[in-house]
Swiss-Prot record:
GO terms for biological process: translation. The lineage of its organism: Eukaryota, Viridiplantae, Streptophyta, Mesostigmatophyceae, Mesostigmatales. Part of the 50S ribosomal subunit. Signal peptide: none annotated. Its main location: plastid. It comes from Mesostigma viride. Keywords: Chloroplast, Plastid, Ribonucleoprotein, Ribosomal protein, RNA-binding, rRNA-binding. This is Large ribosomal subunit protein uL22c.
């Protein structure tokens, strides 16, 4: 996970190569965008989607970066930006009858979450 810092107390964390479709991650990110850190964690804990685990890891990382690098408390953080980008697609083939092979596409994505201080 990479970390960058802006001048106005924003901290960013990125997870690359997550084995999940960007569309499935985007429907979870839309629910937590703009919320406070603690509220977003609670939402992620009770949502029934597989994408919640890597998103919560990135959110934990962004909060740890904010605490370590800027000295911000986790209670004073809010999610200013949450986005997902398409990553490389791994292409595999499934053997089928009579010597055929059907393509299997394994999509990956890149999750970016930026947190900022509320105050």
């Amino acid at each position: 996970m990479n970390m960058t810092r802006d001048a106005d107390l924003k901290v960013k964390a990125v997870a690359r190569g997550v084995f999940m479709s960007p569309q499935k991650v985007r429907r979870v990110l839309d629910q937590i965008r703009g919320r406070s850190y603690e509220e977003a964690l609670m939402i992620l804990q009770f949502m029934p989607y597989r994408a919640c685990e890597p998103i919560s890891k990135v959110l934990y990382s962004a909060a740890a970066n904010a605490k370590n690098n800027l000295g911000l408390t986790k209670a004073s953080l809010s999610i200013s930006e949450a986005k997902v980008d398409k990553g490389p697609i791994l292409k595999r083939f499934r053997p089928r009858a009579q010597g055929r092979g059907f393509p299997i596409r394994k999509p990956t994505c890149q999750i970016s979450i930026t947190v900022q201080s509320i105050k």
